[in-house]
Regions:
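Helix-loop-beta segment of a Rossmann-like dinucleotide-binding subdomain
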Residues: 131-161
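Beta1/beta-strand and adjacent pyrophosphate-binding region of the FAD-binding site
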Residues: 2-16, 32
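Short alpha-helical patches at coil-to-helix transitions and adjacent helical residues
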Residues: 17, 44-51, 159
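Glycine-rich FAD pyrophosphate-binding loop
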Residues: 25-46
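Dinucleotide-binding Rossmann-like beta1-alpha1 core, especially the glycine-rich loop
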Residues: 49-133
Length: 161
């Protein structure tokens, strides 16, 4: 590489560029990565910091995708225990929700199972419990809800890239 010759030029130092550069270089290719601004300064810096298993894909019944995303989430959590924290999420459902709370609770249990029980178990929550847990939430139209776990990065996700 002293001659400045590379096999591959990766343009963009976000998550996709970083992973591509890593994968290519791990296969013996000489890789140059260029970034217009600071490393991971674009979209990779603007995320929610969630490391999730794809809960929303249960609605389309893509169980294979959800299981794969959960496995990836679990591997990251195990590999970087000081950088990821299991976090509880509470979803309150009103009368306009696409599913009744009891059905969403079944989905949360399926999500937990597809995630190989690696997080705290999900919980069905009544309107009264949601009101007690989150007094700032207007529960006048709430029918019930679910509480489940996923992971969050504990610091700047751009640096995690």
């Amino acid at each position: 590489m002293d001659d400045g010759t590379f096999d591959v030029l990766v343009v963009g130092g976000g998550i996709n560029g970083a992973v591509s550069a890593l994968a290519l270089s791990s296969h013996g290719l000489r890789v140059a990565l260029v970034e217009r601004h600071d490393f991971a300064s674009g979209t990779s810096q603007e995320s929610s910091c969630m490391v999730w298993g794809g809960f929303k894909y249960l609605e389309s019944r893509d169980l294979k995708l959800v299981a794969g995303l959960c496995d990836s989430r679990n591997r990251l959590a195990k590999a970087f225990p000081t950088r990821l924290a299991e976090t509880r999420f509470l979803a309150a459902m009103d009368h306009g929700a696409p599913f009744p709370p009891w059905f969403a609770s079944l989905g949360a249990v399926a999500y937990w199972g597809l995630g190989r029980l690696a997080t705290q178990p999900p919980r069905h929550r009544s309107r009264e419990t949601i009101e007690r847990l989150e007094p700032a939430v207007d529960t006048s139209l709430v029918r019930g809800g679910i509480e489940y776990s996923d992971y969050l990065l504990v610091d700047n996700d751009a640096r995690f890239v």
